[in-house]
């Protein structure tokens, strides 16, 4: 590939006005030939990052060609000292380097499915071969792991033109995470198997299979390198909401089952009885066996049959049982545990295998080094429930004590079924499906994302993908039109089940609307303004103008300048900022955009670049739809950061899942509860929100608070578990 790109660049005629502009910019850099290896490596890193950190619009293994090309162009321009660089030149450079990967069959170009959208860059099965790219070329740029703890990236320190406080909890949290030492679980690595190589006929399943193939190759290649190190450290970054992410895109604790199964804390600790309890809970949850209502095991202490009948369910999975019964599962399956075999029937086969090896390690040494996690129960809804003090929501998401864990997705599914009763087709469809399939294919993802303001159209899109992946389209005849209808009803169902969170989201939207404000066009109607602008554009496009046309152009320009946008409501700000409990200053921007379009030729194929570039005018609709998810994400980020900052043990960080040594889980759970309660003990958190988001205190009416006592979390077994 390096040879191909080098030849292509060397053939560029610098005197030809029509020559590839990207090639010209690279070729005119002195010593460009010597930089081709790192330039190709950084291109690979960016494409891989785009494939793994995809936006909601793209599946794993896909990315937008325009956005990917732009990022590559910026990075290459920086390395060849060509910054600042115009957008169109960024794209020509990016296209040049992407072509190398397309030409050699590592990626392919897919036309957009809708007008005015970017081409899609998609990994081919051959992409996995790039895991063999030499380590001395890529160094840490794709590995993201180091032999020594790394200092915090300086770019993270100066956020939005203000200096960070080195003692702020979010800064301390990042430092603590970067001081956690890891090692590779070589026992698990030895039993890693490749995903199936046969192509799937189902498009959704094939996309998942291809993603797993790519993931497998990269994770194992990196693990083979890191297993030779006694320990390694990883670096982290913070986004604009304060959320903490691994910079390594694959082999990290925020990644997949395989990645987590391969990771151990490098420093073992003595295990105690509490540690054995939590290791048993963890082991059972990783396997997560399901039992039919008529086959509940004798070792279960609770009456799950009555519970299932009440919920309309036919099965219960171990992760919905009490903690004691999860331990009971592990005790009843010692033969399975001590066989230490990869069992693909497990929900998380590699994490289960790692827990099996951990039991062997515990028996032999009395020590433990496996990360054992406690997971939040629908974490977004937990924060919304705590803010609104909605007791009913609290019951569904573990803020209130209960004997058997409530299933949030089942509750929304049951309400959905009631709402669909007037639609004969939907009623027949839902009656043909067992509740577990309604929960998995129809209710789950939509109920999860609604907490972050997902609308019916996005929920329908995700729902249709899920039912295709589960083959429910064939089994039950579910169509895209059905998903559109079901998504609208699901939104209503969720809003009925969780009225407090709904009011909280609406309140956040109203505050955002007031803070940004409303501007009206003064001087005439929008139609008149548009007509004048169109006429000026028409006159300017003519080239030479006669005297009458020049006079008209001058008059039109004067009329256009007489139009003004004036603030008629609210504060008229262009951004919304707030300080989170961790000391992080979140800054949310959402500007109107204009379309940028450009034609290009890539690997002999005509493509169209489409990009929305921001203006300097705030997008009030964008602010209103985005404020709730961004605010809630900033709160879950603050919760985790406050826990980590006050934690002196090892920590595996996922936004709603915290891991540590088994012996320390009790202490971590107590710390997790304590921090959350302290965040929301405020009698009226709506006051805090209003003070943070806007300097106005009277114009937006607060919702009524519910009766939830967040202190009840102390007695809840299912808050994090």
Predicted features and spans:
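Non-catalytic nucleic-acid-binding interfaces of large nucleic-acid enzymes and RNP effectors
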Residues: 1-447, 451-631, 646, 669-670, ...
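Short, surface-exposed charged micro-motifs
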Residues: 235, 650, 657
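Short cationic amphipathic helices and targeting signals
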Residues: 245-246, 656-660
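Hydrophobic, well-ordered secondary-structure elements that form the walls
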Residues: 459, 640, 656-658
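Short glycine-rich phosphate-binding loop at a beta-alpha junction
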Residues: 508, 652, 659-662
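Active-site palm subdomain of RNA-directed nucleic acid polymerases
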Residues: 636-654
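Catalytic palm subdomain of template-directed nucleic-acid polymerases
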Residues: 659-672
